[in-house]
A protein has these predicted regions:
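Conserved beta-strand-loop-alpha-helix junction that forms the acyl-donor binding cleft
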Residues: 11-13, 104-105
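Conserved catalytic core of two-component sensor histidine kinases
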Residues: 8, 15, 83
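Vicinal oxygen chelate
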Residues: 1-5, 27-113, 124-126
Length: 126
């Protein structure tokens, strides 16, 4: 049976995307001059970033779509970590969609957008 192993995001600005995901605590390697990077998350799933040029190299008809076809949700170790991670990203100039709040379902929750508009949720149990 197929298993989810990776999530891919097409980046319009690889350096900015790498900076964003590093601010969230991901161990994203440097990739000077390359159009692809991936990082294995603690869960074992890989987050892959590719430039538009890489995608067009094997799919020339590719065009960036509007709207979001996916979102990411990153579990933090505590409610405080949600707040700190959100504040760090917004202070660095990244877009905060929704400031941290105590959700009725029992989690501290916040929403950011990565440099290409991909929603990134941060959460932790209360």
């Amino acid at each position: 049976m197929p298993q989810l192993n990776a999530v891919g995001i097409v980046s319009s600005d690889m350096a900015r995307s790498i900076a964003f995901y590093r601010l969230l605590g991901l161990d994203v390697p440097e990739t000077p001059g390359e159009g692809h990077v991936d990082v294995t998350l603690p869960s074992g799933v890989r987050l892959m970033l590719d430039t538009e040029e890489v995608i067009k190299s094997f799919r020339p008809e590719w065009e960036r779509s509007t709207g979001n076809q996916l979102s990411l949700a990153l579990e933090c170790g505590s409610a405080e970590e949600v707040d700190e991670t959100y504040a760090r990203a917004v202070s660095a100039g990244f877009h905060g969609e929704k400031e941290p709040w105590d959700a009725f379902w029992g989690q501290r929750y916040a929403q950011l957008a990565d440099p290409d508009g991909v929603p990134v949720d941060l959460y932790a149990g209360l």
